[in-house]
A protein has these predicted regions:
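N-terminal membrane-entry
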Residues: 231-241
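Solvent-exposed, non-transmembrane regions of membrane-associated and secreted proteins
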Residues: 1-233, 257-268
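Cytoplasmic C-terminal tails of single-pass
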Residues: 261-286
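Alpha-helical transmembrane segments
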Residues: 244-259
Length: 286
């Protein structure tokens, strides 16, 4: 249990670092000349428009099996050139997870993946973006608590220099091959968060859909909370840090004592071989 919680904390830390790096790049005034946000939005919107002939893209199955996603797709929203397009934040369950291109196993082991073939998460009419993440991994929490969301809750998609807010309006559990709930709906701006269910069984898919609403900080703040699991894992992290610091101190004191005794013996030898005390003899026997 301790090792899995520690791995979970490490992954949370790594995700936080990625998100912090992303935010620093977005907010860095000196980079505004090198990153044309308007152009990035235009490219992403053009990509989404290209998907519209197929309201329910057949490319879902193809994308899931493909090891070589399209170059145009991979280049969209890739301002850090690390395949991270933004991050999803769910205040009610206290998570912030990087969103990467594709839903490959490598991607899903470290964060959330955007389902290629669905709309890129930039909002707009006639769009339906699908964000997928694992649930119940021993090394990462990810979408483990997604089943706690209810109609009326909110989640955020932070991409480039924009924050898009979505209100949950539909929660379905479906068979893996059933993609009808992922269809684009005319005139709608939708995002679905997708994960496996039941917990640790994973034979079905949990789909939490939201429609775009105005972003109001007061509403989001009301939903924020620190869950008991977060308190537990944070406490555990401090326990582990405390044990590590204690171990370092013990090793440092042992090394200092060893060096002190060695220097004392050297001084005794230089002084003509003064008799060794019991502690010196014991040290030599070691």
């Amino acid at each position: 249990v301790c090792s899995s919680d520690l791995a979970n904390q490490w992954n949370n830390y790594r995700q936080s670092r990625l998100i912090s790096e992303y935010e620093s790049v977005v907010k860095d005034e000196s980079r505004k000349g090198t990153i044309n946000y308007e152009k990035e939005w235009e490219r992403a919107n053009a990509y989404n428009q290209s998907l519209l002939p197929s309201i329910l893209p057949d490319s879902f199955a193809i994308a899931a099996a493909s090891d070589k996603p399209g170059e145009e797709y991979m280049s969209c929203l890739n301002i850090l050139t690390d395949e991270m397009m933004g991050y999803v934040e769910v205040p009610k369950i206290n998570i912030k997870i990087p969103i990467f291109h594709t839903t490959s196993e490598e991607v899903l082991s470290k964060g959330a993946g955007h389902l290629e073939g669905s709309s890129l998460p930039v909002g707009g009419e006639n769009t339906h973006s699908v964000i997928s993440a694992h649930r119940g991994l021993p090394s990462a929490s990810l979408f483990t608590d997604l089943d706690q969301l209810e109609d009326g809750d909110h989640f955020l998609i932070r991409v480039l220099d924009q924050t898009l807010c979505y209100e949950v309006d539909q929660i379905h559990i479906v068979e893996p091959e059933n993609t009808s709930d992922l269809a684009v709906e005319p005139g709608q701006d939708l995002v679905t968060l997708l994960t496996c269910t039941p917990y640790a069984v994973n034979t079905k898919r949990l789909l939490v859909r939201g429609h775009r609403v105005p972003y109001e900080e007061e509403t989001i703040e009301k939903e924020e909370k620190e869950s008991p699991m977060s308190l537990y894992t944070n406490y555990l992290l401090w326990v582990v840090v405390g044990l590590a610091v204690t171990a370092v101190l013990i090793i440092s004191l042992w090394q200092y004592d060893k060096r002190y005794k060695r220097k004392r013996k050297e001084k005794q030898a230089a002084a003509g071989g003064a008799p060794k005390d019991a502690s010196d003899r014991k040290e030599e026997e070691r």
